[in-house]
Amino acid sequence: MFWDEVNMKCLSVSQPYADLIVKGKKTIELRTWNTKFRGEFLVHAPLKIKKNVCIKMDVDETKLRTGVIVGKAEIYDVKVYNSVAELKSDYKKHFASEEFLHHKYGFLLKNPKELRIPIPYKGSLGFFNVDLKTSVKANEIKTELFDEEYRYQWIGKH
């Protein structure tokens, strides 16, 4: 389980897309490259914000967190897109603008989780490793995730 992990994969995703992923609104992350990786990963929001996307989607960019790990999600499969029409048909799952319709691979996501306390971290290209043991506030973050996930298991079950 997540709270037992100390070293996790992480992927930088520009804002507002990072927030959309951890809130469960964006379920496909488009990339130009494929991956064999399946499982939980951390979602990192780099410093750059896609302002044109914020305007288009009516997102207040001043409320977006950057330079931090904002949550986690799970990749359970990769969809290969063979045409722009296919990409456009999944728009409500990836929200990519026209400039990204050349991206051929869609990482299919599930089980998103937003952190209430983001972890300050410098991003990198592609998947990179994050050692939670040495991260700032790691114990608090792991405890928070454990508490939230434990509580979630019991909602509506008493």
Model region roles, listed by residue range:
Residues 2-158:
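Structured alpha/beta reader/binder surfaces that contact nucleic acids or chromatin modification marks
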